[in-house]
Regions:
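Glycine-rich beta-alpha loop segments
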Residues: 1-38
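Structural motif
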Residues: 17-18, 40, 80, 103
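Short glycine/serine/threonine-rich phosphate/pyrophosphate-binding segments
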Residues: 22-25, 67, 85-90
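Short alpha-helix at the nucleotide-sugar/activated-sugar donor binding site of glycosyltransferases
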Residues: 31, 71, 94
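Glycine-rich oxoanion-binding loops at beta->alpha junctions
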Residues: 40-77, 81
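Short, acidic/small-residue loops that bind anionic groups at enzyme active sites
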Residues: 41-42, 87, 95-116
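Short acidic-hydrophobic, aromatic-tinged amphipathic segments that line or gate anion-handling sites
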Residues: 56-61, 128-140
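C-terminal amphipathic helix plus adjacent low-complexity
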Residues: 145-169
Length: 169
């Protein structure tokens, strides 16, 4: 909930897998704070979209490929809890040099990343992109936004017709 709320309060756009659990709670937080929420859904149906999604996008793809589209469309990734799907998204973000921020204390995969990370902050010895670890939602969102502002994502990969559009996280 708090991650979505903080993202909205910063004027950024929340993008999730659009269904239940952490995705729904963060979407609710964003909506209640006046934010905009995009849900990237596996398959062709809107049936699984949670009630807080403003823009549901059916990808026509199975879950794992839907996650790749979501990660590729994001400027940064905040990892909360998670299991095997989150592991795939983490790997995809790392391979695509997306800023990765882990919300410590959120359980699941998030509680294990630092232990298996190379030098405590990389997936492997290639050191594609450093993983940041934050203790609370506000710090995680601020870190994500700051990492985006430092030009981690190559400028030519961003296409915005309207400069007033919110930042994507």
């Amino acid at each position: 909930y708090e991650i979505g709320k903080e993202i909205a309060l910063k004027g950024a756009l929340l993008m999730t897998g659009g269904t239940s659990g952490v995705m729904e709670y963060s979407s609710k937080g964003a909506k209640e704070a006046g934010g905009l929420v995009v849900g990237f859904l596996a398959g062709d149906s809107l049936d699984r979209a949670n009630d807080y999604i403003d823009i549901p996008i059916t990808t026509g793809l199975p879950f794992d490929f839907r996650s790749s589209v979501l990660i590729h469309s994001s400027d940064a990734v905040i990892v909360i809890g998670g299991c095997n799907g989150t592991l795939g998204e983490l790997s995809c973000a790392y391979l695509n040099n997306k800023p990765i921020i882990v919300l410590e204390g959120s359980g699941g995969l998030s509680s294990k990343i630092k232990a298996f990370a190379y030098e405590g902050c990389y997936i492997d010895e290639r050191k594609n992109i450093k993983i940041d670890f934050c203790q609370d939602a506000k710090a995680a969102v601020e870190t994500a936004i700051n990492r985006c502002k430092k030009g981690v994502r190559k400028k030519e990969t961003i296409s915005r017709k309207n400069p007033e559009q919110p930042d994507l996280i």
